[in-house]
């Protein structure tokens, strides 16, 4: 099914779902018109009959149509796709506005600060804090397997390390750098596009901190941030190759 047909089906299903009573083709046509679709009532009638045949809707006498349980399930599926598409477009806009140079500058600053935070965390982390980080990695692994976002897991992982480092100045500096709320989702989007994986990096950082080896922890964090920088470069070469290199 084309994206245009999916969007139209989504709008029709949503219109029927939002109504507390069965709806007819005239009502659906007006709702579609308000959403920018100029479709005749006859065409809407044909679409509704096709939806009956697919099992998404059923007629209630002469009153109109309602959604079947299958139709409700289909609407949920399309709503999920709609949100992902909308969110993806938002992230693309954020990436364009932020720009390659700014993203890399942010990551370079993070490399300097977070490498030291990882080093200090390896020295001062408590058993309870180690357990918390381990739990974050466990949930991140589950989210990766299910194809869900790990942006929140990423923020939590790095914040726990910063807190375990017992250096309030570096912790505050990291908060300042990461105050852009879309930074983690943006980097996650870029990593997916270039087929990069962050979980392995996080596991290596955790192992170094858990073994209380400051040098290994610092190096693991440096490698992690450098991998992110490389992902940004790959993404820009792939998507904006013909644009200004400093975009």
Regions found by a protein language model. Give the residues of each.
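Short linear motifs at protein or domain termini
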Residues: 1-109
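Alpha-helix N-cap/N′ positions at the starts of helices
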Residues: 7-8, 98, 113, 135, ...
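Generic hydrophobic alpha-helical segments
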Residues: 12, 140-141, 204-205, 209
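A short secondary-structure junction motif
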Residues: 19, 78, 82, 140, ...
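Non-transmembrane, amphipathic alpha-helical segments
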Residues: 98, 102-105, 125, 146, ...
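Conserved amphipathic alpha-helical segments that form helical-bundle/coiled-coil interaction surfaces
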Residues: 109-110, 116-186, 202, 219-223
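C-terminal all-alpha effector/ligand-binding and dimerization domain
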Residues: 178-247
């Amino acid at each position: 099914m084309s994206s245009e047909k999916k969007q139209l089906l989504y709008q029709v299903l949503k219109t029927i779902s939002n109504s507390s009573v069965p709806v007819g083709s005239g009502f659906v046509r007006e709702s579609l018109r308000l959403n920018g679709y100029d479709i005749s009532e006859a065409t809407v009638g044909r679409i509704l009959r096709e939806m009956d045949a697919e099992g998404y809707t059923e007629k209630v006498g002469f009153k109109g149509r309602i959604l079947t349980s299958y139709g409700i399930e289909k609407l949920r599926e399309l709503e999920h796709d709609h949100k992902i598409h909308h969110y993806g477009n938002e992230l693309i806009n954020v990436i364009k506005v932020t720009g390659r140079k700014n993203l890399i500058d942010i990551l370079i600053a993070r490399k300097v600060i977070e490498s030291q935070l990882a080093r200090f965390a390896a020295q001062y982390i408590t058993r309870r804090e180690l357990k918390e980080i381990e739990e974050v990695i466990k949930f991140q692994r589950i989210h990766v397997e299910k194809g869900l976002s790990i942006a929140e897991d990423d923020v939590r992982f790095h914040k726990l390390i910063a807190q375990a480092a017992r250096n309030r100045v570096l912790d505050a500096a990291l908060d300042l750098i990461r105050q852009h709320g879309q930074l983690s989702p943006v980097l996650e989007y870029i990593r997916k596009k270039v087929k990069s994986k962050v979980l392995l990096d996080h596991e290596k950082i955790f192992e170094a901190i858990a073994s209380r080896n400051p040098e290994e922890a610092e190096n693991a964090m440096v490698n992690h941030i450098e991998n992110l920088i490389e992902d940004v470069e790959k993404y820009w070469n792939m998507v904006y190759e013909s644009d200004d290199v400093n975009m």
